[in-house]
Amino acid sequence: MALRLTLKPGERAIIGEAVVRNGRNRVHLLVENEVPVLRESDIVLPKAVGTPCERIYLALQLVYVDPGKRPEHLETLRVLTDELTQAAPSFRPLVDQILALVAGKRFYQALKSAQTLREHERELLTRCTETRN
């Protein structure tokens, strides 16, 4: 079954190992084989990463889109998730869910679950900031 992907004008996406950018008009694509697909809104650039959960998301993104270096990215992911759960045990259930998806090679779903991890981190950081003020 093909994946239907709609790109807005100027929107980028990763399809397989290629970064594509749409032209002036909305376009509908059908991806007919099993390759990583990420929309621009789901892509995190290394220079934009600043928090532990963002680093975990980036490691997962690389696990998904860079299969040639997957063992290295998985090791980075392991180290980052260990550090996070030691520092903040409240993240353990979300991290365990993500790692279970990774173990099942469900990398896209793990990436989506990592969005929840990032949201939880943002909420905690917001609460800390509000408490200080």
Q: Which residues make up each language-model segment?
A:
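Terminal leader/tail segments of proteins
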Residues: M1-N133
